[in-house]
Amino acid sequence: MKNAPAVSFSAMPSADAERPILVFDSGIGGLTVLREARVLMPDRRFVYVADDAGFPYGGWEEDALRERIVELFGKLIAAYDPEIAVIACNTASTLVLDDLRQAYPSVPFVGTVPAIKPAAERTSSGLVSVLATPGTVRRAYTRDLIQSFATQCHVRLVGADQLATVAEAHIRGERIDEALVVEQIAPCFIEQDGNRTDIVVLACTHYPFLANVFRRLAPWPVDWLDPAEAIARRTVSLLKPRRADEELHHHNDLAVVTSRNPDYAIRRLMQGFGLHFA
């Protein structure tokens, strides 16, 4: 069982601050979702939360991780009063989204789930792979998506136990082991009855940061399906429209890291995304 220190958060900077959109991930992979959300909602305020004290989530027992995330959100909601919360993490979404909605019914939650439905609609060969963390692969929720939307396809679930950590290293500018990447993605590629896998669903928000590496190392071209834009669109659809005469008190977008001690590479990355540390 993995443990992480308890965390607390400061209150929002002022009483008249605009209620933010809170984007949450276990690390920095959710920045892919933040990037798309800002494109669609440039006038909104964001708080990005990286639970780096608990990263990676794959090392946790499910009950302990569920308890941690639900408790963490109680503190985040009290501190930042978000208008909506985006769980930009497949592992957290498939495990705890229902618990969060039950615990905090006043806050709308948008989850991140494997993009199996659009993959099934888009595939030409009928061979689709889902590249995910082992936790996401294990969850009944993922298999329910296949049963609901992709019974006409052959869907292979691939649990990559090291890619999220590799992605974090890549984002930091560190050298990565490309042989390890090849080993992790190889099971995604199937040849069957003259057909080949033509879509790989990126079912972890860290993975789009490795998309160019995947393309270069893949045995043949496929469509690497990134759900970030769809998550951003769903968020927009749940927000209340602004009044034409609404006066905004826009403050800086914030970065919150639960370790309270981000290293230089993370600080530089967050600042490159225009985030200010809380």
Swiss-Prot record:
Annotated GO biological process: cell wall organization; peptidoglycan biosynthetic process; regulation of cell shape
GO molecular function: glutamate racemase activity
Keywords annotated in UniProt: Cell shape, Cell wall biogenesis/degradation, Isomerase, Peptidoglycan synthesis
SUPFAM superfamilies linked to this entry: Aspartate/glutamate racemase (SSF53681)
Domain of life: Bacteria
EC number: 5.1.1.3
Family: Belongs to the aspartate/glutamate racemases family.
Protein name: Glutamate racemase
